[in-house]
From Swiss-Prot:
Keywords: Aminopeptidase, Hydrolase, Manganese, Metal-binding, Metalloprotease, Protease. Mn(2+) 2 binds at D259, D270, E433. Transmembrane segments: none annotated. The keyword Hydrolase applies. SMART domains: AMP_N. Binds 2 manganese ions per subunit. GO terms for molecular function: manganese ion binding; metalloaminopeptidase activity; peptidase activity. Mn(2+) 1 binds at D270, E393, E433. Its cofactor is Mn(2+). Its EC number is 3.4.11.9. This is Probable Xaa-Pro aminopeptidase PEPP. Pfam families: AMP_N, Peptidase_M24.
Amino acid sequence: MAIAENYDEVLKGKYPAKDHARKVAKWIVDKGGDKKGTIYLEAQKQKLNEDNDGEAPFRQRRYFFYLSGCELPDSYLTYDFPSDKLTLFIPPVEPEEVIWSGLPMSPEEAKAKYDIDDCKTTKEVNPHLASSSETAQSTIYAIPGQISDETTFLSYQNKDLEQLKTAIEYCRVTKSDYEIALIRKANVISTNAHINVMKAAAKAQNECELEAVFLKSCVERNAKNQAYHSIVAAGENGATLHYVHNAAPIKSQNLMLLDAGCEVDCYASDITRTFPIKGTFTDESLAIYKIVLDMQKQCINALKAGVLWDSIHELAHKIAIKGLLELGILKGDVEQIFKARTSVAFFPHGLGHYLGMDTHDTGGNANYADKDRMFRYLRVRGTLPARSVITVEPGIYFCRFIIEPYLKDDQQKQYIDEKVLEKYWSVGGVRIEDNILVTEDGIENLTPTPKEIDEITSLVKSG
């Protein structure tokens, strides 16, 4: 059986906060940190919208959630290395607040729900941090900018505000069964939403209608939060990588690019599908779709633990070059075009990124200052470890703003046939994105969303 394949069964347990705390502590100690140290983290504060008394949308701090599994605002936690004790602090009962919001979770309820050793109210944070014979000789680890003014670390000999954030970011790269189960569940819910959008596309008159279909499908399955702002792009709007207006009329455009994913208990899905709005590709859009699908399949098949992500990104470009040469959009030799980086005009972004609590998850070691345009926006650099989850999202785009400077560049324009290119502007963009779990021997694809040509055209026509 695949890892966490029966995700509902896995999710009957508790979020593994204690294992995460141990993992982070080990990372710190292995890097020369204090074996007697203490981790201190704060939840996000509940805030009001500016100039009114309505609550702003709440998003839990991911660093806090990773060591707690707790989505309550205004909370705190500590993890003591020597005693292996994880303590959560949650807001006490405020009588006036109960009138409006009902009774909050009690410490007893929190201790039963979360993978922690003890739970107290936030009134006890500073007494808990007060001096003892142990803390007087140890180090407190915290994240700068995430320490309340009223919190004091005076009892600790050392205060380290550098290692903890980095430690958590690296530890988040490799996922537990529980985390994989959450991502699987988010993918299943999002897949249902993608299918519903495909079925609704032919009758839609505006991009916003299809965004509404996606959101409804997620919310009615209790996935009320989106991992990111959906991209619902018809026709040439799909050439804008992070198009978020989602409000253009749907008229004669051929393709719809839908990049959308819900989150489940703070864990994201990130799925892109491109499909013909009426169920039939044009010759040009079908040709580009076939290239992108080939790019994705070959790159996914090349993955396993220890593979260099840079090399997979290069593979995607070489497949794109070969395909565009066959169509006549590019001309010349594959290696010459690759060396000139001409394919970046059509595939300007990185092949993918780590996925977890954030859509663009931590630990990727991106180098946005890279002078090589092919790698500047590659969000993961280096080898992929087992149990990492990464998106594989190749694309080919016909964006005038990006391509036209290449047509004016003496080195680049020799590789592009402008007459052939002219037929493809209306394609806009094609991107196909799956969420891939890397294993020791290969991969598990966490994204069951249809992408084969016969599948997606049949779904659209069935609407």
